[in-house]
Amino acid sequence: MKFEEVIGIDVSKLTLDAFIHSHQIFTQVPNTKKGYSKLLTWATKSTGCLMDKVLFCFEHTGMYSYALACHMTEKQMNYIMVPGLEIKRSLGIQRGKNDRVDAMRIAQYAYRRREEVTTYRLPEKAINKIRQLLSLREKLVKQCAGYEASLKDLPDFIESSESKVLVGVQRNMIKALAREIEKVEKEIDSVLESSPDIMNNYRLITSITGVGRQTALYLIIVTNNFLSFDDHRKLASYAGVAPFANTSGTSIKGRTKVSPLANRKLKSLLSACAVSAIRHDPEMKLYFNRRTEMGKHKMNSINAVRNKLLARVFAVVRRGSPYVPLCQYAA
């Protein structure tokens, strides 16, 4: 779509600072529902063009930008949400910053890419709820692990006669947290059952040896149920498991390696899946052993397994049928 105007929005907790690129006009509104309506009214009057010809751009700032994205979707506006790091690196060397300048820089970024961008598609409510539940579960699991580690170390530093209360309270906390984690798991199952498309992809992904429940759920929310990524290589790059060359002319001949710019949570989950697949999937075990026997580094081979697992995930989702181990048909 050809856009006639671009508006950059700097999102903060309390306010939205907006800048119209070609008119060089600035405004500030509250980060509330009334503020969103005021922003769209201002944009309509100030640009003088139809709203379907206007592209809005703002940074992805979590819950502060989510409500704005919901309002934009409801009003059928064209908008993109972009990571702040991408905008920052695209503008070259910059000095100084404030909300107005940030809005102008966001507008400049969007204007340069207005002909190549794909407007943002807000995930369905079920995916957003799974994301919130997984985040809560992660916090509860970390707390539980903290108490378990404390209990394990307690006997080394305190006499058993003096630690009765300390042990009792922490054991009760572990039991309470375990119950809350179970509640969260049941709620996730309820959300899955309410959305057939998500449940279908969840079952397909977990049919792959080595890919467990948490990884399958995280892949679904990261890919917007496989609508935001159409290729496993793009997701591999996003997860930080895609190898990139590191050479330049005759002076730099570095090793091919993965980028530190990555979704570290997804990368960690894929690493655990790769280790599990090597242990339990004969085909992956053979593939891993063959690479190491060729002299490949262990982590290099594990990374290759991570990429193969992502390829399998996209294959089963695209095909719409569970993974079938080929080794069981081998002669």
Language-model segments: what does each one mean?
Residues 1-21, 106:
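Gly/Thr-rich phosphate-binding beta-strand-loop-beta motif of the actin/hexokinase/Hsp70
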Residues 13, 62, 86:
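Short, glycine/acidic-enriched loop or turn micro-motifs at the edges of active sites
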Residues 23-50, 55:
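Nucleic-acid-processing active sites and adjacent nucleic-acid-binding tracks
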Residues 52-64:
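Short glycine-rich phosphate-binding loop at a beta-alpha junction
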Residues 79-204:
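Long, charge-rich intrinsically disordered scaffolds of nucleic-acid metabolism proteins
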Residues 118-132, 159-162, 254-257, 286-303:
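Short, solvent-exposed helix-loop connector elements
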Residues 207, 213, 217-298:
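Phosphate-backbone recognition surface of nucleic-acid-processing proteins
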Residues 250-254, 288-331:
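Low-complexity, acidic/Ser/Thr- and charged residue-rich accessory regions of DNA metabolism proteins
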